[in-house]
């Protein structure tokens, strides 16, 4: 790894702070028919930017979402700073679809000095690996000025997010909500949508990378709730309003760089009905532990006394620090409350500092599916020299030579540092991959697998051994689960989705330091799943990236993800 990257980024950070970036350009972000006039009881002739007067023989609406990646100065907590964002907002525009829809998102990179790529977190991408959005694995980065149209099928439903998977970009604001509508395991009256919890700084996250790589991770400054907060008397709190007696669905997501949260609402309990994209048997709670990239759907009944209540994102201090941890809050106001002042409520929740997941016994999938564990792959996580390593190898990708390109060229040999594990469905493994991860003392690690939900067979203290008990009866399944400090995590997933799939720690520093591997799944079946048009798109994106890289001011100096 080269030190030039750190010095270049530091210069970039200081320049960005010294000179204001352009203000946000407002870009349409929803489906066209939702952008202009709505088709309502009194405007039935209207259809977005079209109407009953439109000649349908010559004009057909183009549906999809349009996202623009850009540098702008924003004041999320009252302090102006350079950010990266989609369409001028943090979080970016919500992408909404129904279960079974085909989703089309056009992403344009208006950054002048960096590439980008967008990952649709938790989307299965069945037979669709080319649109998973990981540079160096499923695509080349989108070069400045370029546009890539992502296409995927909503095979699963629930709550998630989309974000940049290029270096540390999402930590500077490059993320947004992704909601796939579908059934729920409990009833409610109002869907309040996504509630984002994230850490935040007043300098670009990139400028902290040098410290994160060479020593202890930096202490982060503050945090945001749905893209807003206060700092030293400036800014504003996130607020939402309840009507007494109604039930509200809230989709909580942790999009932090290095922060684990305990979410609660003073004076309220709630039902938990989903984890990640998996509906669960509802259970009652007064708080939930939310690791990085995890999502929980909760239903809150407005049954407290009319008034104002704090919404809290409690910082989990065992894994990282935050200077203003106690200030990551929002406000719940009841209809009928005459006060607009800050709440005076206190929390009765027992504070947790563990950085662990919700108890496994609480996380019962609503649709029971039993995994198979006939053969187990073992991997050990270690650290040293500013890197994290799986079985002694730290991930290091080449953005111009993604894994999928080798597959498209009928190859099956990758550099050692690509950390490739080939997997195939066989009679011996009965179509299941089982991975036992053992880790050292130190921080917990939220492990995310692309292309699959996985079943958690065991999670606990101590390294995995042949005597470790495995749960094979409807264990929790999701796409992010925590590897405990000095402990183990045993996961299983079905070998049913040809592609190259990244597995990594979702602490951004650790991902950049190489804490990742990839599964090349059913290699001979990957190419047949990619149509000719998609192969052409893939190749054109790589050609544009290769043409731009000779002028790239910031050479790659992290793992690539």
Curated annotation (Swiss-Prot):
Cu cation 4 binds at residues 445, 505, 510. Cu cation 1 binds at residues 119, 448. Its cofactor is Cu cation. Residues 1-20 form the signal peptide. GO terms for cellular component: extracellular region. Disulfide bonds join 140-542. Binds 4 Cu cations per monomer. GO terms for molecular function: copper ion binding; hydroquinone:oxygen oxidoreductase activity. Its main location: secreted. It is found in: Secreted. Lignin degradation and detoxification of lignin-derived products. This is Laccase-1. It comes from Botryotinia fuckeliana (Noble rot fungus).
